[in-house]
């Protein structure tokens, strides 16, 4: 149940199928009949998890095929872009298909954005939703939702926004990082999918995680993403550049608290290479983890009103206000300037 609430069932299923996670079914009774029931229940559970594993593999293959087609399209038309979160994160897992897939998020800098719109609409014959509710347009292709970002993340401070945008655009122009997928157009050859460099990738995933935690709430899926990212990039992240950038965008205290949480609850090593944590960081680590566990995937576990409408919008706003007060000292400027807007956007999306 917990795995479902936090959208990490694929990770559990993969672990069980590979023999790295043991399955036990408990029963208060101790009898031969009870033992037989437990064995049957265990067999049913394992079979269901095997089905989950197969479904995840099929879904990942579909995402890979479509994303390879997208990368081929962008490459042919010389469009600068990066894919982030989602499929880019999945590549850091030991088995990419174990991570639950959602949307395909990609960013195109302003210099290429309008041309990219025309290329996608013409080549894929899709209608792109251009409503500027948040920071991206959206469209569906082959049953997969694409979010086409004109801005990767939004900040309350204009100064912070300009610094962040400049950093991201410089990284996109360099085009040094990516991952390979089997080319859907070119047969047996592979196509390179552009992604952010380790330091920039961490900043984006962390900032996205923290903002969701403040508004709707955030679950283990997104939190495990950060743990995997920090572990896999431990020798590639430029610590001085990272900490300086986080200070420039007003999120350094929040990141320190995250590191404390990762060290305490996820046994992350090497935290000292970033900074020396203090007592306040440790205190916020406990608060962060408690909020993650009570939230579930994007806060759905904590909602009382599951249907859309005014009740859901009011509940979203109420919950966000409580989170903002609890974590105000971790990112005060953005909470004051940006979060009210994020609450309004999130509430409107739930109407």
What role is predicted for each listed range?
Residues 1-29, 37-102, 108-351:
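Conserved NTP-donor binding/palm subdomain of two-metal-ion nucleotidyltransferases/polymerases, i.e.
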């Amino acid at each position: 149940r917990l795995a479902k609430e936090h959208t990490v069932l694929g990770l559990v299923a993969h672990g069980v199928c590979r023999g790295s996670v043991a399955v036990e079914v408990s029963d208060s009774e101790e009898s031969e009949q009870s033992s037989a029931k437990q064995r049957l229940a265990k067999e049913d559970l394992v079979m269901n998890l095997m089905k989950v594993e197969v479904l995840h593999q099929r879904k990942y293959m579909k995402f890979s095929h479509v994303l390879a087609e997208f990368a081929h399209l962008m490459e042919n038309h010389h469009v600068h872009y990066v894919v982030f979160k989602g499929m880019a994160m999945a590549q850091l897992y030991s088995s990419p298909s174990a991570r639950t897939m959602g949307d395909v998020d990609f960013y195109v800098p302003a210099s290429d954005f309008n041309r990219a719109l025309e290329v996608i609409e013409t080549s894929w014959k899709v209608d792109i939703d251009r409503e500027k509710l948040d920071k991206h347009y959206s469209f569906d292709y082959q049953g997969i939702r694409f979010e086409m970002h004109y801005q990767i993340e939004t900040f309350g401070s204009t100064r912070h926004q300009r610094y962040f945008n400049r950093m991201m655009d410089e990284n996109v122009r360099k085009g040094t990082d990516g991952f390979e997928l089997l080319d859907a157009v070119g047969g047996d050859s592979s196509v390179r999918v552009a992604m952010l460099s380790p330091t920039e990738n961490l900043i984006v995933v962390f900032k996205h995680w923290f903002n969701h935690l403040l508004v709707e709430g955030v679950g283990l899926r997104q939190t495990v993403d950060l743990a995997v990212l920090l572990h896999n990039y431990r020798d590639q992240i430029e610590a001085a550049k990272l900490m300086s950038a986080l200070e420039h965008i007003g999120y350094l205290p929040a990141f320190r608290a995250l590191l404390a949480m990762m060290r305490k609850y996820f046994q992350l090593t090497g935290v000292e290479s970033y900074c020396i944590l203090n007592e306040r960081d440790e205190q916020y680590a406990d608060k962060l983890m408690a909020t993650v566990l009570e939230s579930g995937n994007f806060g759905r576990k904590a909602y009382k009103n599951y249907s859309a409408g005014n009740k859901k919008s009011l509940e979203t706003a109420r919950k966000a206000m409580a989170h903002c007060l609890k974590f105000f000292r971790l990112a005060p400027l953005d909470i004051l300037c940006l979060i009210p807007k994020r609450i309004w956007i999130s509430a409107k999306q739930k109407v």
